[in-house]
Amino acid sequence: MTMIIRKYFSGIPTIGVLALTTEEITLLPIFLDKDDVNEVSEVLETKCLQTNIGGSSLVGSLSVANKYGLLLPKIVEDEELDRIKNFLKENNLDLNVEIIKSKNTALGNLILTNDKGALISPELKDFKKDIEDSLNVEVEIGTIAELPTVGSNAVVTNKGCLTHPLVEDDELEFLKSLFKVEYIGKGTANKGTTSVGACIIANSKGAVVGGDTTGPELLIIEDALGLI
């Protein structure tokens, strides 16, 4: 049974900048209390790790992952890297952990991926091969609604994709084909925020959306991600 819940992370509705999830794992900020961690784990049916990245709680903005790989920025600290690798090993997950040496460290804002494809910002074009090798999927370079922050302006799972509301229909078709998803749609979260990737973490089993998200927005999110 799929689940979707509204949630604040310590009062913050932009939970997508603070966390990332795949089908198997969820990375969450250290400041989150255990009850919230357990609730997220239950909704997404994932193993959760609380960590900083580069000393920052902006885990979702700074990293990106799918079932094959985890991409981290060059500012990741050794202790954090060891913590993440140990967590993966303890859970018998053999992911390609790759540090992307770009000066653009907000990888989660600049990469959109599921287990079937990835869209990366033109700002990361020099790292396309590294990203492709780690995530083990077809990688395309592009924008969403003409914005280079593709990870901030959409959210994708193995079932569906929700994009910035100004995406054109032909762009929707391109994204649907790239990510090989059954469902796709345009919408907002957190009372009209167009950067939906900053407001939502989701996989094929469930979604956690920012606490300011309205009922009508929630219906569109559920539909686009195939969670109904």
Curated annotation (Swiss-Prot):
Q: Which InterPro entries match?
A: eIF6
Note the SUPFAM superfamilies from the entry: Pentein
Q: Which GO terms describe its molecular function?
A: ribosome binding; translation initiation factor activity
This protein's UniProt keywords: Initiation factor, Protein biosynthesis
Record-level GO BP terms: assembly of large subunit precursor of preribosome; cytosolic ribosome assembly; maturation of 5.8S rRNA; maturation of LSU-rRNA
Which is a Pfam family this sequence falls into?
eIF-6
Disulphide-bonded residues: none
What does the entry list under GO cellular component? cytosol
PANTHER family given in the database record? TRANSLATION INITIATION FACTOR 6 (PTHR10784)
Q: What does this protein do?
A: Binds to the 50S ribosomal subunit and prevents its association with the 30S ribosomal subunit to form the 70S initiation complex.
HAMAP family per UniProt: eIF_6
What does the sequence similarity comment in the record state about its family? Belongs to the eIF-6 family.
Protein name stated in the entry: Translation initiation factor 6
Source organism per entry reads: Methanocaldococcus jannaschii (strain ATCC 43067 / DSM 2661 / JAL-1 / JCM 10045 / NBRC 100440)
UniProt gene name: eif6
